[in-house]
Amino acid sequence: MLRAGAFDDYEVVEPMSAFKWKRLIQIGEVQHVLPYLSRGFSKHEDDRQLTYTESLRQEVERISDQQIPSVDAYLLTITQEEPQLTNFLSKRKLKKLRKRELNSEDCSEETLQMLNIIIHNVNQTLSKGISLQGIIEMGRFLRTKGDKVDFVKLEQWLHQLGITRLASLQGSILIEVFHFDMNEIPFMQKEEKAASKLTQRSLTHMAADTAENWHFRMRTNGMVENNSRVLRRNLRRSMRYMRYNPVETISSFMANFAKSLSEIEE
């Protein structure tokens, strides 16, 4: 459904129970991809394999007014505050890199935009899990503006910032989940074999991850308590991405931990 809605990639939909269809829409809400699901349903409305129960019809009707943002509108959303890396040294490198590029005579706006999308996805992945919205928007950007990106320069930036493998993971998801060709993603060094598994895990667990906030509370006796289950879940998620960039992964975890401490509720 998402492939059809986001990239016009039509294929026959396998029959699913009403429960699974409802679950798909719930995941779409959590992942912020309802506009693409809605368009996917529209493209498959004559598919005989898609059996509409009354409850499914009501759900499809409920999301039918979702509008797909333009690529430029999405870029504006994620760059209202420039995406940053968490690690201090990487953040400083990124600041210098951006300043140098903006002052360059051959400044490439599209290459900076591509970098912003990648960094935004890195932040989402390390703090919440893989974002299908971010991956889809990366794919849309590549197919609409990729010809204007200086991929040689982009690869150099990714290497300098130490996020080459995290970027390759994003590209691998485009290949595994959305059937992109590798030649559409020039910045990829290699396909990450765990891409599909990590995506499935994020889809399964993100609803639970976002249902409970990870924060500390002040008890009446002055002691501070934390939801240990959510803490362990965040720690396990961080461990899954250690191989891709241990420094940024640890920095992201500690930043989220510190933020939780700063928001202690009484």
Locate each region found by the language model.
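Conserved NTP-donor binding/palm subdomain of two-metal-ion nucleotidyltransferases/polymerases, i.e.
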Residues: 1-266
